[in-house]
Amino acid sequence: MNTMEIEKTNRMNALFEFYAALLTDKQMNYIELYYADDYSLAEIADEFGVSRQAVYDNIKRTEKILETYEMKLHMYSDYVVRSEIFDDMIAHYPHDEYLQEKISILTSIDNRE
């Protein structure tokens, strides 16, 4: 897998984490098997009794849906920015217990499922 494929896989997995609840069961299953579990199109097609083309089309449509959700809601990009700010604050104020506690609370809110 080349660098671009790895980046796309990581992005799709991240978007899936944020927006999975907005997808249909079929979309969730296909994306999770393809990106998270590294199934091939043929393996997914066999699992669901459909053609590889049907799986491919569904995955491509779902990728666009996930990107559209992100363009409108910015949940993933906002999370990345918050994480970078928290990391920076932790690095610059390692002895400020009050600040560390508040960052910990905010981080736990971001990481709730």
Swiss-Prot record:
Gene3D superfamilies: Winged helix-like DNA-binding domain superfamily/Winged helix DNA-binding domain (1.10.10.10). This is UPF0122 protein M6_Spy0905. Belongs to the UPF0122 family. Pfam families: UPF0122. InterPro entries: RNA_pol_sigma_r3/r4-like, UPF0122, UPF0122_fam_protein, WH-like_DNA-bd_sf. HAMAP family: UPF0122 (MF_00245). SUPFAM superfamilies: Sigma3 and sigma4 domains of RNA polymerase sigma factors (SSF88659). Might take part in the signal recognition particle (SRP) pathway. This is inferred from the conservation of its genetic proximity to ftsY/ffh. May be a regulatory protein.
